[in-house]
Amino acid sequence: YLSYSYVSSSLNKKVYIDERERLLLYALPDRVVQAAEGTALSDVTDLENTEGKTAPVWYEQDGTCYVSVTFVSHFTDQSFQFFEAPGRLYIDDSEGTRRQAQILEDTQVRRLGGIKSEIVTDVTAGAQVEILDSMDEWSQVRTENGFIGYVRNDTLSGETVTEYTSDFVEPEYTSLTKDYDICLVWHQVFSSDDNNDLSSLLEEARGVNTIAPTWFSLSDNEGNFTSLADTSYVETAHERGLEVWGLIDNFNKDVSTYEVLSRTSTRTALVENLTQAALDCGLDGINVDFESLTADVGPHFVQFIRELSV
């Protein structure tokens, strides 16, 4: 297992844990993989070769969340190798150039470059090592069984350079692009009557091809929002060749954006209801205008955007 903080910061930013509702989530292009705390690896249908594996996908101990390497490796383009005695895990890039050499004689791998440095492990003549870095008299190497340390350069021979390619299949996260420059205006809509002003306002606008009416606004901490959406407004805009991106804001001071986005239940409600509202009136897109976000909201906002994009 690896700490969640390490996984999300160094290996795969899409691994997300909702510590309030005890869920691990992973957003794929067409769905969100979900595992409650204690869920066995074998119960996650998106994982392969996990039959009979009852170990949990993730757990929390002493305030730290840990995620199964099996789960992480399934979604991450990295090489993971386990070794025993002592137990250790070696993580490396799946592709790239690697320098390798053969050990000429029995020697020691040392913690630092120097004969007085602590011995990490012994290596025998003929063993293969990967060269990680080279100095004048010593080189940093990784042994076949995953130890990293330094050996003298005169104990190395037959250096080769090998190009490795990854067989990892990255999910395709698609996005919408336009083959023209977007000229967008916002339409401040305070009441449903303001929607009737679209035609007259467009008479004064030149070169505009996208309009974002301020229709949606968070109304409580449960993921609900007010709506001034109007199907006829969208139809009028489309007749004039404009796309309509409905705007949602977080300007209500009685609403905590953190409370809404940090819980999967409320975030899901917001995503589902907002998507349905967009479909109901034929919107071309959604303009998320969440402002004054604090650092603690950041990861949850990113997850919200991931889920909204599914």
Predicted stretch roles:
Residues 1-135, 157, 165-173, 177:
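Primary recognition of N-terminal secretory signal peptides and signal-anchoring hydrophobic helices
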Residues 30, 144-146:
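Glycine-centered tight beta-turn/hairpin loop motif at sheet-sheet or coil-to-beta transitions
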Residues 106-108, 147, 152-199:
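Boundary/entry segment of secreted carbohydrate-active catalytic domains
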Residues 109-112, 140, 191-198, 218-222:
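Short, solvent-exposed loop/turn elements at domain surfaces
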Residues 126, 138-143, 151:
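SH3/SH3-like beta-barrel fold
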Residues 179-188, 205, 217-310:
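Chitinase-like catalytic core of GlcNAc-active glycosidases
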Residues 193-201, 258, 301:
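Distinct, well-ordered alpha-helical segments
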